[in-house]
């Protein structure tokens, strides 16, 4: 179970 990458490291 893992959250979308944008949750803890948003794409700039």
Swiss-Prot record:
GO terms for cellular component: extracellular region. GO terms for biological process: neuropeptide signaling pathway. Keywords: Amidation, Neuropeptide, Secreted. The keyword Secreted applies. Coiled coil: none annotated. It is found in: Secreted. The modification Leucine amide is found at residue 12. Corpora cardiaca. Belongs to the pyrokinin family. Mediates visceral muscle contractile activity (myotropic activity). This is Pyrokinin-4. It comes from Periplaneta americana. The lineage of its organism: Eukaryota, Metazoa, Ecdysozoa, Arthropoda, Hexapoda.
């Amino acid at each position: 179970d893992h959250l979308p990458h944008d949750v803890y490291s948003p794409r700039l």
